Structures are given as C-alpha cells and as structure tokens.
Amino acid sequence: MCHAVALAEFDPFEARRQANILRTSDYTATNGQSPAYEWNLSDPNPPIGAWASLRIHQIQKKNEGKSDIYNLSSAFRKLLLDYGWWANRTDSKKESMFDGGFLGLDNIAIFDRSKPLSDGSTIEQPDGTSWMAMYRC
C-alpha cells in the first residue's frame, strides 16, 4: 500500500482505488491478513494499510482542500481486521514481540529470511515492532 501513498500526490482518486483493491477479498484474507509482496503474498507484513489510508487522506486534503472521509471510514473495518490479525500473531520465541514483517528500504536480501541460515542461526527483524509502536502514538 505504500505505492498508493506516493501516487496520492498526483492522483488521489487512483491512490484510493489502489489501496481499496488490496483490501478486497481477492487479496486480503478473511482473517484480515493483507498481502505482503509479489514473490510471497502470504508473508506477514505489519498493518501499514491504516497508515497508508490516513496519509492518502491527508495528502488529498492538503492539495485539494477536501478529502474523501467516506472512503477513509469505509476502509476502517478491513484495516481493523488487518491490525487484529497482526496483533494476535504469536512470535517464534513466544516473547510477545511482533515477529517478521520486514519492510526495509529495498526489501531485498541475499538469502531467504523466512528460513534459518546454513549455520542454523536466524535473523531478528525489528520492523514489525517498530510499525506497531506507531499505533501507540
């Protein structure tokens, strides 16, 4: 959904349409999980849809002096499901941390982050926890 935020500066209607497409049953699971990225749609990603929807709303209001509050409110149910799915996941070590959800600058790694490394070690990714902390602000 981050791509829709970038699009909002030029075409807020299309930005909302793009964000709404990702919230349809074609992409979002019934439990609220939203798609991750094209090479693995079922990977866990933090619930960034709420942030994206709010930013699109804010950008349109700043640029056009008006915004589509109906679109924002109609997205709320799906966004709440996505947040609930993420908040209720169990981390791999059962330490009540938000596990996974890598959303780095380029989202590219030289190895498969979902599997242990050849020496058996794993990589801890703080991305999910940092995204969830944003909801407390």
Predicted regions, residues:
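Well-ordered alpha-helical segments within folded domains of soluble proteins
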Residues: 1-8, 15-18, 43-55, 129-137
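Active-site acid/base region of carbohydrate-active enzymes
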Residues: 9-12, 22, 27-30, 44, ...
